[in-house]
Amino acid sequence: MHATTTTRRGHQLSETDARKMWTLALSAAARKAENVSDLSDLLLNMPSELRSELIDFSAGASRQGFFLIRGLPVGELPATPLEHRAGELAEHGSAGLLTLVADLLGTLVGYEDEKDGTLIHEVHPVPGEEHRIENSGSVAFDFHTENVHHPLRPDFLGLLCLRQDHEGVAATRVASVREAYALLTDGQRDVLRTPVFKSAYPTSFSRNIAGPRPSSGLHPVLFGQEPDLFMRFNSHTTTSDDAVASRALRALSEALEEVCHEVVLAPGDLVVVDNHIAAHGRSAFTPRFDGTDRWLRRCYSLRSTPRWAERMMPRPRVLPALMKITGVL
């Protein structure tokens, strides 16, 4: 393992800008905006340097594929929950922070068949689910791009830390295909560009599906040309029936490990990941279930939603269930 621990990369908010962001965030949370335009005045009033850097990041030219914001307020918090409940901290300022960042990058969205379309996801350990490879677990979670099985994958995801783990060791691990590409052979690159891979639905999308988990249609893992390389990959669910392709997947996992950045998030840190450039994961930690366990909040942002998908949304910002759009893209 040759991971680099990231400590200073990104934007550090001044106290003045942090207070301003919290005021804007409280307003955003209270509005329950159905559209980005509902928050346009707040987005324009975000601290100018932060706003400019996020807009630059949204253009997709980043080599490392992530942007770190430090020094955000998180407000008063209840005990870390022992179960995942819809609407946790629904009007809390942290929901407003994530909404503003997601709407500046694109549009805050959820998925009808993931957590009933919840827009802000709680990431904390749940008793009895420690070994699940999703946001209720505490075991190591290997590299993946979010919702790899889905035709309308998020362009960005944000992870805001409310509480750190007790030992302060849990790291969000981020690895860019643009940094890993040089470690692959020409043959591996060619195979990874071939549509011979499939990705099973993650458990967060398949908890209520009987029988084997369904999979996506065949797809490539790498696409685009340097410097604009992109990736669609989940080390847990992306597979191929071809032996050569399977070896190329292992090579990609090893290359991502070589270039990994480990970001140990403290309260008030927000990491934004470009979901087409960088895969992310989590190191293991030990929960105590004492009300002070690690707690992150997650959001998705999509830069453009097809008009047909908008018309099929069950409610604003929530993308239609996969059974309704399978085969459309």
Where are these regions (language model features)?
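Active-site environment of non-heme Fe oxygenases that use a 2-His-1-carboxylate facial triad
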Residues: 1-49, 56-57, 61-83, 121-267, ...
